[in-house]
Every structure is written in C-alpha cells, then in structure tokens.
Design a protein with these regions (language model features):
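Conserved small/polar residues in nucleotide/adenosyl-binding loops
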Residues: 282
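Juxtamembrane/interfacial segments around transmembrane helices
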Residues: 66, 74, 113-127, 189-198, ...
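Aromatic-rich transmembrane-lumenal/periplasmic boundary elements in polytopic membrane proteins
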Residues: 186, 193-252
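Membrane-interface helix-loop-helix junctions at boundaries between adjacent transmembrane segments
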Residues: 114-117, 124-136, 148-149, 153-211
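Hydrophobic alpha-helical membrane-insertion segments
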Residues: 15-32, 88-102, 177-187, 221-243
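Early transmembrane hairpin of solute transport permeases
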Residues: 2-162
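Membrane-interface interhelical connector segments
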Residues: 37-45, 238-278
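Hydrophobic alpha-helical transmembrane segments
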Residues: 12, 134-141, 175, 179, ...
C-alpha cells in the first residue's frame, strides 16, 4: 500500500519537472514588463513591452494548462504497460469528461445551482480547459479522470476481441470503455463538486485566518511526509491548484508582482497566502 502511494506521489512530480524553466520565463517576463521596476521602457505600448509580453504569454503555458498536464502525465508513472498509449487515452478521456460536464451544465445549470454564465477563473468555480467551459476542478479532476483511465487501461488494454473487431482493440477499446464510464462520472461531478467548492472557500478562509499557526502546521506536515515520499500529495494542491488562491500560490506570485512592486502596503495585507510559500518543497 505504501509503495503504491509513493508511486502516486512520484507520478505527481512528473509535470513539476517543467515548472523550473516555465517559472524562470514567467518571472523574467513579469519583471521586464513591470513599469515600476524597469521604468519608461516597460510602459504600455512600447516595443520592449510587446516583445516581452509575447514571451510571457508563452511562459504561462505550463501553469495555465496544469490540469491537462497532470491528466496526461500521471500514466507515465502508473501505467503498467504501454504508458505512452495510456497518456493518449487519458488525454482524450479527460476532454470527453469535460465536454460531458459542459453539456450537462449548459442544459441544467440553474437546476444544479451553478452560474454557468460566470467568467472562467472567478470564484464562481468555472474554468476553461482546452477551450471547454467546465467546472473548475483543478488538478483534482485531472487526477480523478486520469486515475480511472489508468485502471481501465491496465485492465482492458490487452483484451482479446474477435478478429473482425480487431480495429477496436488496444487503445480504442480502452477509450470506448472510458467514454461510457466518463458519462456517469460527469453526472456525479456536476451534482457534488459545486458543494465541494463551497467547502474549499471555507477552508481557504480558515487557513488564511489561522496566520502563523496555519503555516506552522502546513510546514510541519510537509516535513514529516518527506521521508515517505508523500509530501507532493500535500503541497501540490496548495502551490499549483485553487486550494488557497485561484490558480495556485506560485502562479499568484507572478500575477501579483506588478502590484506588489508598486505598493507600499505590507506584504501580509497584499498577499496573505505568501506565507505558505516554501521553495524547498519542489525539490
């Protein structure tokens, strides 16, 4: 059991390998487009700002598509066979799941108590994933769907079909089964996840109101889990997902830099979530 959990924690770290370079690009792009730091050269409309904005937008690729990356990357560490094909199956199944959720909400959002007309990325819990308006489940939704697909892949990938159905074997058969499974999961998610989002908002406030005590508990638990290789399970939702702040703490840092640089107010007021940042945690 412990080995399985450790493998899961290690698989979670796979997308994190991309964060170092992406973080450097975002950091430099944000720095060089902040007028209060760079001066008039970084004013809006200058060639300097336009060029660095292009680079900055490219740098956000990893952080803006985190759920998709986690959905695709998890099979690399957990699929027992043909991991590459499992990644493809997870990718398509995850998109299928989100299309199901989007279609259900388009038809029954008022009855489900969801404001599906809200802008993506707001507190209303709506997100856009690969161009699909859906519920904002962050990496939790990606891990759920990817985990289901991995289980189906390990179980059905080698299923023997009659010769005349051979075209449906392998990855095609896994996707067929996944397609069927995604629909009831989508139904359950649209019923349950809005209530989970309410609980997450309460949890965010509790952690922020706890101040140094909350930070101390977080850091203590993280350090305790490091010898077991399970610390990724604790910090990933805080740093890369919406548990504390929309988009994750690291993405929030980059977004907040221009405002922080231009303000004279204490950091504790401008970014109370910043106290949970621990750069050593990503090692």
């Amino acid at each position: 059991m412990m080995k399985a959990i450790q493998r899961f924690g290690g698989a979670l770290f796979t997308p994190a390998m991309l964060f170092a370079f992406a973080g450097v690009v975002v950091g430099l792009g944000t720095l060089f487009t902040t007028e209060s730091i760079m001066g008039p050269i970084a004013a809006a409309g200058t060639t300097w700002t336009k060029c660095w904005t292009v680079i900055l937008d490219g740098g956000w690729t990893v952080f803006n598509q985190l759920p998709l990356l986690f959905a695709v990357a998890l099979p690399i560490g957990l699929a027992k066979k043909q991991a590459g094909r499992c990644c493809l199956e997870a990718f398509v199944a995850y998109l299928t799941f989100n299309y199901f959720v989007s279609s259900i909400l388009s038809a029954w959002a008022p009855e489900l108590g969801v404001d599906f007309s809200a802008s993506a990325g707001t507190a209303e819990g709506i997100a856009t994933i690969a161009g699909i308006r859906t519920l904002d489940m962050g990496i939790a939704g990606a891990l759920l769907i990817s985990g289901v697909v991995i289980a189906l892949h390990n179980r059905f990938f080698d299923t023997r079909l009659p010769e005349w159905l051979g075209v449906f074997s392998g990855s095609t058969f896994v996707y067929m089964v996944s397609f069927i499974v995604m629909l009831p999961i989508a139904v359950v998610v649209v019923l349950v996840w809005p209530k989970v989002q309410v609980g997450m908002h309460v949890f965010q406030q509790v952690i922020l109101d706890a101040g140094t005590a909350g930070v101390g508990i977080f850091v203590f638990l993280e350090r305790v889990l490091i010898p077991f290789g399970l610390h990724h399970l604790l910090y990933a939702p805080f740093y890369y997902d919406n548990v504390i702040v929309q988009g994750g703490i690291y993405a929030a840092w980059a977004n907040a830099l221009p405002g922080l640089a231009a303000s004279t107010r204490p950091l504790a007021e401008l970014a109370p979530w910043a106290s949970l940042t621990d750069r050593k945690s990503v090692v």
